[in-house]
């Protein structure tokens, strides 16, 4: 009985250790802790009519220089004690979260850790979190150790509040022809301007 109990315990540990979900292409539905981490093996797309809910505690790891293009409803809402993480899987930086013009303005990033990203490499996505012709909310997130801009707004009225943005190689928050609500953010170790208003931009701070 003792041997059986030990074997069952070891099998349970092995199952937990190897629990992961590989993802690529079109995604939707609900991502749960039970199936975490989610490993992106190629670019990800959330289509305009689809919804993705990411539960607190989930880790999303990009297994290469891949991006996530968001056209639908995206709800990554963690908690103060149980964040959602977007990071690299290994030593190669991933690209970015790109909220495009069809993205639902009710989309949210809240209590997320976003790290080791870089720019997507094509206009108008010059940050690690990008809002292009869309106005979701990002709050209580930590964005760190990223190349190029931390958060980039392009023709956007996004709410950007109470985030920590640190160790960024370009601008912390950049607004290009945008009017965002930028409040309560902490920015440090930013290579260039912490908050850059570019080309007829304005913000409530």
Name each model-derived stretch.
Residues 4-15:
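Bacterial N-terminal signal peptides
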Residues 17-205:
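Beta-strand/loop edge motif enriched in small/polar residues
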């Amino acid at each position: 009985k003792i041997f059986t109990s030990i074997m069952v315990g070891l099998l349970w540990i092995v199952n937990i250790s190897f629990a992961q979900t590989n993802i690529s292409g079109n995604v939707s539905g609900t991502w749960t802790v039970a199936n975490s981490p989610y490993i992106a093996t190629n670019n990800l797309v959330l289509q305009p009519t689809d919804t993705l809910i990411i539960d607190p505690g989930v880790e999303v790891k990009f297994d290469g220089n891949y991006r996530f293009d968001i056209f639908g409803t995206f709800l990554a809402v963690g908690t103060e004690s149980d964040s959602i993480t977007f990071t690299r899987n290994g030593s190669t930086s991933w690209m970015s979260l790109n909220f495009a013009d069809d993205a639902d303005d009710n989309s949210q990033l809240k209590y997320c850790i976003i790290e080791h990203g870089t720019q997507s490499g094509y206009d108008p996505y010059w940050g690690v979190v990008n809002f292009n012709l869309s106005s979701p909310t990002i709050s209580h997130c930590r964005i760190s150790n990223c190349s190029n801009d931390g958060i980039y707004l392009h023709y956007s009225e996004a709410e950007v509040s109470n985030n920590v943005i640190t160790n960024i190689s370009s601008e912390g928050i950049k607004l290009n022809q945008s009017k965002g609500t930028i409040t309560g953010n902490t920015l440090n170790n930013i290579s260039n301007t912490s908050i850059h208003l570019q080309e007829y931009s304005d913000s409530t701070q």
